A protein has these predicted regions:
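Acidic, metal/ion-coordinating pockets
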Residues: 1-177
Length: 177
């Protein structure tokens, strides 16, 4: 099914390391990590791109994040949304279109203006811009005012679509502009 699409993007909500899924400080706190072999299933299922724009890609610090990107690169999986570097944008060409992927993580990014500038730049240089925004409240089936306000600012800055994640439930869709 996934292979029938021109591009398929997956939100990788955790690291890909050899670590155990336990906090180093408190054994009662789970930290999300996957065995590297799990990426073989991601690749074989047909996913092309992985979003790392979420609140669990830092569960094992910068070292765990770098191990994750190394594991992705070993399987030729493209990625975007560096938890530690707000300036990253992924651009891929597909069927003659330049498509930009910009990650936004409510829990990591400190410089919101920089995110808007990245979207503007991506819009000026590419045909399509997708913003993957990791934001909102867990288990709420309707987006909050923060999500709506920021998603609209992303669109106003040049994004063609904003895809949200984090709440663990399906939320509403808004057609804006």
């Amino acid at each position: 099914f996934v292979t029938s699409f021109d591009l398929a993007v997956l939100n990788l909500e955790g690291t890909v390391t050899g670590n155990e899924s336990l906090s180093l400080k408190d054994k009662n706190i789970l930290r999300f990590t996957f065995e590297p072999i799990a990426l073989d299933a991601v690749f074989n299922t047909g996913f092309d791109i992985v979003s790392l724009s979420n609140n669990h890609t830092s569960d094992f610090g910068r070292e765990g994040f770098l191990e994750t990107t190394k594991n992705l690169e070993a399987r030729n999986l493209k990625y975007f949304g560096d938890y530690f570097n707000e300036s990253e944008t992924l651009v891929v060409e597909k069927k003659g279109l330049k498509i930009a992927f910009v990650g936004f993580n409510e829990f990591a990014y400190k410089n919101f203006d920089q995110v808007l500038e990245r979207i503007k730049k991506a819009s000026n240089e590419n045909d399509v811009v997708f913003v993957f925004a990791h934001f909102g409240e867990e288990y709420k089936d309707f987006g909050n005012s923060f999500q709506q306000k920021n998603a609209r600012m992303f669109i106003d800055s040049g994004a063609d679509a904003v895809i949200g994640a984090h709440p663990h439930v399906v939320q509403n869709i808004e057609i804006y502009k």
